[in-house]
Amino acid sequence: RSPHAHRKVLARAHHGGAKVAEQAIAACKSTAAMWAATSFEERARIFLKAADLLAGPYRAVINAATMLGQSKTVYQAEIDAACELADFLRFNVSYAARLAEQPLSAPGMHNALELRP
């Protein structure tokens, strides 16, 4: 229901039981190895594409959903949903890339980091 108009139904949701939860977990586990084998560049491309979609063609949709679901004004929704979500996606790609860089180290020292999704 809408937080500002309690009689207005925004959506109806199905509540799955234990079997549905187990199926969802199994589906996630079955794709874990594939995601782990995906290169950083490809993962980054996926997240940056999502950011571009949120900042572009889906901007009005995400803002409208935020306005309805959280009783935000158009200005609040723009800041809290479209802009911030796209920024988070882009920032996290940038930050993940920085994790692969070598930190400042003494001569002859090399640091390695293995990230496991």
Task: List each model region and its residues.
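Conserved small-residue-rich beta-alpha loop and adjacent elements
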Residues: 98-117
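Glycine-rich loop-to-alpha-helix module at the N-terminal edge of alpha/beta enzyme cores
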Residues: 6-100
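Glycine-rich phosphate/pyrophosphate-binding loop
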Residues: 1-5
